[in-house]
């Protein structure tokens, strides 16, 4: 559990769910953190500010096996992105290995499994890591910065991924020489300290 590792080293933690019943159960489960925890409904398919959330006010969002259930994943990611400060992080737990047939067999009978209206998810509401990376880059994120997955996809087809909310400033800080933000036009000299490596050579050409 995240809170077991955080202890009280955080200012506030907002627990969200579309169901009020789940929020009530969560309040009982996390009763020891009542001074720092807030419980509010959140529908990722709606704009965050229309639900009483302040935009760009969160340092991190943790989404556990939920984004893929949206009718439109791109819009859901944009809604979550609006919650994050520039430079904030989104942590995703999602089913990314699409090979195990047992998952489709077990979940295929549930209406929510077919909630998506996207054409590329006709047979299963899951995306590969490459698809997640591309979609995240299109919706205001850096793409998948890191992915942790089991070596045996059949045994554990889930991945934990981290991506960063980016704007021009954050993109510049992440990759100064590749950012769309231009350097000072009056800069006459640029010193690159990196030794005689291939990466340094690529930067200087």
Regions found by a protein language model. Give the residues of each.
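4′-phosphopantetheine-dependent carrier domains
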Residues: 1-205
């Amino acid at each position: 559990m995240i809170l077991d590792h955080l202890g009280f080293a955080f200012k506030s933690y907002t627990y969200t769910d579309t169901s009020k019943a789940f929020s009530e159960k969560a309040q009982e489960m996390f009763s020891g953190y009542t001074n720092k925890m807030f419980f509010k409904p959140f529908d990722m398919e709606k704009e965050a500010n229309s639900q009483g959330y302040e935009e760009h006010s969160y340092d991190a969002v943790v989404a556990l096996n939920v984004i893929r259930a949206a009718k439109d994943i791109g819009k859901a990611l944009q809604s979550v992105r609006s919650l994050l400060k520039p430079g904030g992080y989104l942590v995703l737990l999602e089913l990314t290995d699409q090979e195990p047939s047992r998952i489709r067999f077990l979940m295929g009978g549930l209406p929510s499994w077919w909630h998506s209206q996207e054409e590329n998810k006709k047979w299963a509401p899951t995306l590969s890591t490459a698809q997640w990376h591309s979609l995240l880059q299109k919706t205001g994120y850096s793409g998948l910065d890191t992915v942790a997955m089991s070596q045996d996809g059949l045994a554990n087809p889930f991945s934990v991924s981290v991506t960063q909310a980016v704007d021009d400033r954050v993109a510049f800080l992440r990759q100064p020489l590749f950012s769309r933000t231009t350097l000072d036009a009056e800069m006459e000299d640029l010193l690159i300290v990196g030794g005689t490596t291939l990466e340094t050579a690529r930067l200087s050409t």
